[in-house]
């Protein structure tokens, strides 16, 4: 179930403060965060976030099409290694 509109989008305060400081100084440094749950707002456009995926920080450059989504959607936590090849020779034995 989606979040109620009267509550507004969830953004961690520390993340919003870091973006506001960079916007005031007109700098674009990578912002390291563990907050995968924060919603992307229009103030984030043009910034790069290093979103934690459980073992490392994945760089995510925010564009207009990402507004309204969560930061965690762009940093996958699972690595797909591919399906195991079917070995027919060993099955016959």
From Swiss-Prot:
Chain coiled-coil ranges: none
Gene Ontology BP, a term: translation
Keywords: Ribonucleoprotein, Ribosomal protein, RNA-binding, rRNA-binding
GO molecular function: rRNA binding; structural constituent of ribosome
Record keyword Transcription present: no
KW Ribosomal protein (keyword) present: yes
Annotated Gene Ontology cellular component terms: cytoplasm; small ribosomal subunit
Pfam (any one): Ribosomal_S19
Function: Protein S19 forms a complex with S13 that binds strongly to the 16S ribosomal RNA.
Family: Belongs to the universal ribosomal protein uS19 family.
Protein name: Small ribosomal subunit protein uS19
Organism (species): Mycobacteroides abscessus (strain ATCC 19977 / DSM 44196 / CCUG 20993 / CIP 104536 / JCM 13569 / NCTC 13031 / TMC 1543 / L948) (Mycobacterium abscessus)
């Amino acid at each position: 179930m989606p979040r109620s509109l009267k509550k507004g989008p969830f953004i961690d305060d520390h993340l919003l403060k870091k973006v506001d400081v960079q916007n005031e100084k007109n700098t674009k440094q990578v912002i390291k965060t563990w907050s995968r749950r924060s919603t992307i707002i229009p103030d984030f456009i043009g910034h790069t976030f290093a979103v934690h995926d459980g073992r490392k920080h994945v760089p995510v450059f925010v564009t207009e099409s990402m507004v309204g989504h969560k930061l965690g959607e762009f940093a996958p936590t699972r690595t797909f290694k591919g399906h195991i090849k079917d070995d027919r020779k060993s099955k016959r034995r």
